[in-house]
Swiss-Prot record:
GO terms for biological process: cell maturation; defense response to Gram-negative bacterium; inflammatory response; natural killer cell differentiation; negative regulation of interleukin-17 production; neutrophil-mediated killing of gram-negative bacterium; phagocytosis; positive regulation of interleukin-10 production. The modification Phosphoserine is found at residue 50. The lineage of its organism: Eukaryota, Metazoa, Chordata, Craniata, Vertebrata. The gene is Tusc2. A lipid is attached at residue 2 (N-myristoyl glycine). Keywords: Lipoprotein, Myristate, Phosphoprotein. It comes from the Eukaryota. InterPro entries: FUS1. The keyword Lipoprotein applies. Residues 1-33 are annotated as: Disordered. Belongs to the TUSC2 family. This is Tumor suppressor candidate 2. Myristoylation is required for tumor suppressor activity. One of its GO terms (cellular component) is mitochondrion. It comes from Mus musculus.
Amino acid sequence: MGASGSKARGLWPFASTPGGGGPEAAGSEQSLVRSRARAVPPFVFTRRGSMFYDEDGDLAHEFYEETIVTKNGQKRAKLRRVHKNLIPQGIVKLDPPRIHVDFPVILYEV
């Protein structure tokens, strides 16, 4: 839990040279990378939603229903979490866009 960076190995999507090499790698390898790969923007414009719609069309992270339990002649209300008939929210547009987690830039230095 926690890390949401990419686990793939290979070319760094934001680098101009493969593997972040020095000046010696700036020659033919750089032109090869540019011709194969397209420019990747450092921003993320959408994300997967974390909420759900229920049968009534309500949107929330979790849904509960109230059930009445009779124990020793006393009625007691309990909340039971609903897991069925929930529809994921889908793709959510981010406003403003966020910086990609793999973008190599220092935002704040002490």
